[in-house]
Amino acid sequence: MAETIRSVDPSESSRLTEIGQLTALAYLADGLVDQAHPYIPQLKDAHTRASDAELLMMVDGEDGEGPVVGTITVVPPGSSLVELATGDEFELRMLAVSPIERGRGIGAKLTQRAMDRAVELGASRVVLSTMETMHVAHRLYERMGFQRREDLDWTVIDNDDGTVQRLSRAEADKAERAGTAIHLIGYSWAP
């Protein structure tokens, strides 16, 4: 099937709602969060992502009007969505593919387009983080040329508002023993 990848304008409210729902659904389907998780509202809030970063979507059909099957966020320097990037690095966040559309290479196509877009916008490097348990994502990023960067690893705990609190090493060790920590591993790619 033909597909189209394009940027989503912040004024495309219905598309942004669709993207938010798809993002939350993908994270739920993978068991990364449950319905009560404080991150769900942030996953659903594609409107904020589109206003403070570049949101890409893939839709079925050449006309760009079909259903959204995947999305990724390209985060520029200075955005409030930056978690890892420094200087003129860009960051990729919230790659999500419809659970019923997996196996079509959608994640790879979206990631490549996001990498290309970051370079078009002046990125010296592209960084991202992913949960330690997301082995399929690790393989995807490594196939696409991302290098594992232990210096970008970080450990967080969830806040009630859907944000995360970055922990010091000592705090992380304690939280990991208590089972409340989430360890994220970092990757980077240079054009």
Describe the predicted segments one by one.
Residues 105, 122, 145:
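Short glycine-rich hinge loops at helix-strand junctions in the catalytic core
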Residues 98-100, 104, 132-133:
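Active-site acidic-Proline motif in GNAT/NAT acetyltransferases
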Residues 137:
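Helix-turn-helix
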Residues 104, 108, 112:
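Residues forming the Rossmann-fold NAD(P)(H) cofactor-binding site
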Residues 118-129:
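Conserved GNAT acetyl-CoA-binding A-motif
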Residues 3, 7-99, 111-113, 117, ...:
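Acetyl-CoA-dependent GNAT
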Residues 127-130, 142-185:
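Conserved catalytic-core motifs of GNAT/GCN5-like acyltransferases
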